[in-house]
UniProtKB/Swiss-Prot annotation:
Stated name of the protein: Succinylglutamate desuccinylase
Function statement: Transforms N(2)-succinylglutamate into succinate and glutamate.
UniProt KW keywords: Arginine metabolism, Hydrolase, Metal-binding, Zinc
Cofactor: Zn(2+)
Binding of Zn(2+), residues: 53, 56, 147
GO terms of biological process kind: arginine catabolic process to glutamate; arginine catabolic process to succinate
Record-annotated active site: 210
Biological source species: Salmonella paratyphi C (strain RKS4594)
Cofactor note: Binds 1 zinc ion per subunit.
Family: Belongs to the AspA/AstE family. Succinylglutamate desuccinylase subfamily.
Highest taxon above the source species: Bacteria
Length: 322
């Protein structure tokens, strides 16, 4: 199964759907779904996902290289792993999504969207995670969902963590820093993301990793992701990574800007970078007689997008944590 990506992009079902690797067993579970189980007993389970948005190809290429290293035996596997290529049809077409944004659908929210390939896939992925986690006795559960951003950013690599009722474990946050993340953003409310689903329903330590800018297959400079790739290799092999000398900056979400109608106007242009700062009182958006302004001394924008569908998020506003 050293051609997992090619099979996923072509929509081809392999002739052989399970076999042996170098110190592990593999099972092809469906298009874009591959389970890896070490021969030796382990108590750690990891979801490694990419391609939830089909135009975010660098993380997919990164996972493909990690799989090649595992199959060649140059990388040892010490976790049960479910590899997920989230949206195969959008990946093959080179587009963000075919009908609707899947990363708003998890936790059953797909039921409120018009039926499409994405709603069916979101349901399939929910069931796949349920089966994966329920079939083992993992003491440690992680989910790393790899993305790239539409816009440039003041932080080249950053992580977005779902709302969580319990404190985050220090070793997980330390690993994110060792993986080269320059900033961590903490959600304060539930959402429809893949990582919120795995955290809420299975207690996984989950993070969406944003690793640079979205580019087509073959146009990615994977050297800029080398620190993350090396950290993933060490993680899979059970090798402790050195702590970052500069821990990631921390932010929390303080508000969400939502587009409700065609009257919506977001006062940020296409060159506005993620983590751009705005002073208190700045007008951020208008919709009819509703005005959205900065209420804290300084707020930072994340994922500004004026062209989202009505009812969806047009941006997040953040506050820097000490």
């Amino acid at each position: 199964m050293d051609n997992f990506l090619a099979l996923t992009l072509s929509g081809t079902t392999p002739r052989v759907t399970q076999g042996k690797g170098a110190g592990f067993r593999w099972r092809w579970l469906g298009h874009g779904l591959l389970e890896l189980t070490p021969d030796a007993p382990v108590d750690r389970a990891l979801i490694l996902s990419a391609g939830i948005h089909g135009n975010e190809t660098a993380p997919v290429e990164m996972l493909d290289k990690l799989l090649s290293a595992l199959y060649s035996g140059s990388l040892t596997l010490t976790w049960r792993v479910l590899v997920v290529l989230g949206n195969p049809q959008a990946l093959a077409a080179g587009i963000r999504y075919c009908h609707s944004d899947m990363n708003r659908m998890f936790g059953g929210r797909w039921q409120s969207f018009a039926e499409s390939d994405e709603t069916r896939r979101a349901r399939e992925l929910e069931l796949s995670l349920d089966t994966f986690f329920s079939s083992g006795q993992a003491r440690v559960r992680w989910h790393l969902d790899l993305h790239t951003a539409i816009r440039g950013s003041h932080h080249l690599r950053f992580g977005v963590l779902p709302q969580r009722d319990r404190p985050w474990e220090a070793d997980f946050l330390a690993w994110l820093g060792a993986a080269g993340l320059e900033a961590l953003v903490f959600h304060q409310a539930p959402g429809g993301t893949f990582t919120h689903f795995s955290s809420e329903h299975f207690g996984a330590l989950s993070c969406t990793l944003e690793l640079g800018k979205a580019l087509p297959f073959g146009q990615n400079d994977l050297t800029q992701f080398s620190v993350t790739s090396q950290a993933l290799s060490a993680l899979l092999s059970g090798i402790e990574t050195s702590t970052s000398s500069s821990p990631p900056l921390r932010y929390r979400v303080v508000s969400q800007i939502t587009r409700h109608s065609d009257k919506f106007a977001l006062y940020m242009d296409a060159q506005t970078l993620n983590f751009t700062a705005f002073a208190k009182g700045t007008l951020l958006a208008e919709e009819g007689d509703k005005r959205v302004t900065v209420t804290h001394d300084v707020e930072y924008v994340l994922f500004p997008n004026p062209s989202v569908a009505c009812g969806l998020r047009a941006g997040l506003m953040l506050e820097r944590l000490p």
